[in-house]
């Protein structure tokens, strides 16, 4: 059978078309990979910053041998955990024991889907973005409870129960604060919430319109991250390491990663909800209204927005790290009393007050 040149060219064109379709099908993965790379770098930076700040507070030198200024210390620790033996408890529930850390990590990573890191730079601009974050973040304590229960260790089980109780206690005030912000912005979308703060620059931030909600959100976020003075689920003096007691190797490393990912997510949401997100702080001055000429300027706008967002997020990171090394740990009864008897009524009153002002202004 003889094939003429026209048929050969037709076959080649079809093969090129199929190749282009495959390439186009893989393009959607690039933003996700870029986000994962950025998250990895941010976690390494946060670990290094915490060690440097804690060393400064305690008047120590801090990490200095692994790379210049100790920048590679976090990578060295991660490599060590990756190469360590993964020990399983002989009488534990092995399936639950293995899946617990994965549930905690995945639930935190999914929260990044709705965070607008910069101008037009968000993976999923959903109309229920902040509620999706609250729903997803409530899954992480289930993984911690599974880890504590499946370890067949009383310290681990108590740590898991504490994690669940702490999450429930502070999730409700956190939700009320988010609802108040949504009422002010008339939207549950994270992008719309940032846009609603863009008109007056620094003076348009929700921080000034919701000062009580900001303080409650700040305290609740620290409790959700299980940072001092709220690290009751893993109190060394009482529970050895809490739900992490029986873990080793990469699984222990995943729990270590969860704490810093949670801190990063909380910092970014403080920025998005209260500090104007990617918007420039000076009133009536915006980088994004001056240049609308080509794609290069659009990329520059996005990079500037990401830089502004991360700069604001690092402010919360600095506050949380400083609090960790300056305040003592609370007792469990004090922690629950703070959540149920103090923060919950204040956040509910703040929500009712915001609702009243919104109804009056209609």
Swiss-Prot record:
It catalyses: a plastoquinone + NADH + (n+1) H(+)(in) = a plastoquinol + NAD(+) + n H(+)(out); a plastoquinone + NADPH + (n+1) H(+)(in) = a plastoquinol + NADP(+) + n H(+)(out). One of its GO terms (biological process) is aerobic respiration. InterPro entries: NADH_UbQ_OxRdtase_su1/FPO, NADH_UbQ_OxRdtase_su1_CS. It holds the Pfam family NADHdh. Its main location: plastid. The chain crosses the membrane at residues 27-47, 103-123, 128-148, 164-184, 202-222, 247-267, 303-323, 335-355. Its EC number is 7.1.1.-. It is found in: Plastid, Chloroplast thylakoid membrane. One of its GO terms (molecular function) is quinone binding. It is a multi-pass membrane protein. GO terms for cellular component: chloroplast thylakoid membrane. Keywords: Chloroplast, Membrane, NAD, NADP, Plastid, Plastoquinone, Quinone, Thylakoid, Translocase, Transmembrane, Transmembrane helix. HAMAP family: NDH1_NuoH. NDH shuttles electrons from NAD(P)H:plastoquinone, via FMN and iron-sulfur (Fe-S) centers, to quinones in the photosynthetic chain and possibly in a chloroplast respiratory chain. The immediate electron acceptor for the enzyme in this species is believed to be plastoquinone. Couples the redox reaction to proton translocation, and thus conserves the redox energy in a proton gradient. PANTHER family: NADH DEHYDROGENASE SUBUNIT 1, NADH-UBIQUINONE OXIDOREDUCTASE CHAIN 1. Belongs to the complex I subunit 1 family. NDH is composed of at least 16 different subunits, 5 of which are encoded in the nucleus. This is NAD(P)H-quinone oxidoreductase subunit 1, chloroplastic. The gene is ndhA.
């Amino acid at each position: 059978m003889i094939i003429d040149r026209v048929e050969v060219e037709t076959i080649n064109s079809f093969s090129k078309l199929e190749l282009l379709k495959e390439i186009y099908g893989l393009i959607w993965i690039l933003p996700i990979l870029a986000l994962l790379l950025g998250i990895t770098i941010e976690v390494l930076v946060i670990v290094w910053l915490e060690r440097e700040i804690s060393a400064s507070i305690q008047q120590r030198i801090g990490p200095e041998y692994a790379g210049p200024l100790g920048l590679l210390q976090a990578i060295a620790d991660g490599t060590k955990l990756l190469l360590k033996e993964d020990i399983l408890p002989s009488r534990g529930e092995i399936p639950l024991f293995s899946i617990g850390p994965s549930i905690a990590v995945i639930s935190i990573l999914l929260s990044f889907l709705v965070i607008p890191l910069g101008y037009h730079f968000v993976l999923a601009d959903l109309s229920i973005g902040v509620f999706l974050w609250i729903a997803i973040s409530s899954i992480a304590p289930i993984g911690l409870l599974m880890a504590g229960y499946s370890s067949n260790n009383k310290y681990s089980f108590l740590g898991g129960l504490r994690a669940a109780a702490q999450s429930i206690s502070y999730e409700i005030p956190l939700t009320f604060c988010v609802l108040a912000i949504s009422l002010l912005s008339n939207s549950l979308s994270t992008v719309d919430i940032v846009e609603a703060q863009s008109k007056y620059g620094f003076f348009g931030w929700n921080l000034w319109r919701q000062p009580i909600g900001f303080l409650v959100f700040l305290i609740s976020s620290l409790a959700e991250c299980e940072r001092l003075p709220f690290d009751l689920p893993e109190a060394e003096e009482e529970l050895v390491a809490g739900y992490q007691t029986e873990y080793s190797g990469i699984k222990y490393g995943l729990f270590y990663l969860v704490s810093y990912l949670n801190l990063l997510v909380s910092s970014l949401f403080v920025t998005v909800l209260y500090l104007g997100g990617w918007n420039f702080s000076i009133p009536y001055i915006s980088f994004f209204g001056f240049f609308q000429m080509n794609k290069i300027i659009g990329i520059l706008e996005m990079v500037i927005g990401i830089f502004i967002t991360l700069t604001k997020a690092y402010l919360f990171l600095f506050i949380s790290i400083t609090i960790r090394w300056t305040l003592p740990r609370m007792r469990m009864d004090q922690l629950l009393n703070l959540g149920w008897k103090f923060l919950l009524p204040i956040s509910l009153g703040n929500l009712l007050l915001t609702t009243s002002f919104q109804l009056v202004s209609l």
